[in-house]
Design a protein with these regions (language model features):
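Short, Lys/Arg-rich amphipathic segments at extreme N-termini
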Residues: 1-32, 189-192
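Helix-rich interaction surfaces within compact, conserved domain-sized segments
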Residues: 161-169
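Divalent metal-dependent catalytic cores for phosphoryl transfer on phosphate-bearing substrates
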Residues: 7-15, 34-162
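Short, contiguous clusters of charged residues that form electrostatic/catalytic patches at enzyme active sites
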Residues: 25-29, 94, 98, 166
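Charged phosphate-binding loop/patch that engages nucleotide di/tri-phosphates or the phosphate backbone
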Residues: 170-199
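Charged, low-complexity, helix-prone segments enriched in Lys/Glu/Asp/Gln
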Residues: 82-83, 148-152, 168, 187-194
Length: 199
């Protein structure tokens, strides 16, 4: 059983933006509600959803420091790190995983992987990681049309891999329109999602 109130108190020590805190709580509750539908442990889902943005308000230099410490543990492979170092914000999930180990003694690989990969996704990641990536994109407080479409796939169509694929389609399309860099993990993830969906 997860001690939800203590985890939320811990989250508030790291995040000061109330909208972001609300997003994390909403993601956690949404994941807990629908996890078992996709054969995912609901407690693991709650923790992943609640703490995925734990390091979002951390400075870039601290994100890099924490990320390097996490990589040294060799629990989860962090691909394209040299590239990501130029865009430290995308490593906030990796930094969050290191905080979770140090401060909360969370050492379950599946949870740590899901937090590491929630921003860009990745190739061949676990169902919990896939679910965290999707729910970060489509939790009920997300108020834009693509998120609502993915939400509907999760809630009404019961199709995890379709939701996963569409999350990438919307994410990559948005980056292309804005002429932003696409992290290679997202390309790997898209290809993996397409393969899973077409199985």
């Amino acid at each position: 059983m997860v001690d939800e109130s203590n985890y939320i108190k811990f989250l508030r020590k790291y995040l000061k933006n109330e909208d972001r805190i609300s997003h994390c709580i909403s993601t956690a509750n949404f994941m807990k509600e629908y996890a078992q539908k996709y054969n995912i442990d609901k407690d693991d889902a709650y923790i992943s959803g609640l703490l995925h943005d734990l390091a979002k308000d951390t400075t870039n230099s601290k994100i890099l420091e924490l990320s390097k410490s996490f990589i040294k543990r060799k629990i989860v492979e962090i691909k394209y790190f040299e590239y990501k170092k130029k865009h430290p914000g995308v490593l906030h999930g990796v930094a969050a995983a290191e905080i979770m180990i140090k401060k909360l003694k969370i050492d379950k690989r599946d949870i740590l992987e899901s937090v590491c990969h929630h921003t860009c996704g990745g190739g061949n990641i676990s169902d919990l990681s896939i679910f965290t990536f999707i729910c970060d994109f489509c939790e009920p407080l997300r108020n834009y049309t693509p998120s609502k479409k993915v939400y509907k796939i999760i809630v009404k169509e019961n199709n995890l891999y379709k939701a996963y694929l569409y999350s990438y389609i919307y994410l990559i399309k948005r980056l292309l329109i804005k002429q932003k860099f696409i992290i290679p993990d997202s390309i790997d993830g898209y290809n993996s999602a397409l393969k899973l969906y077409k199985k």
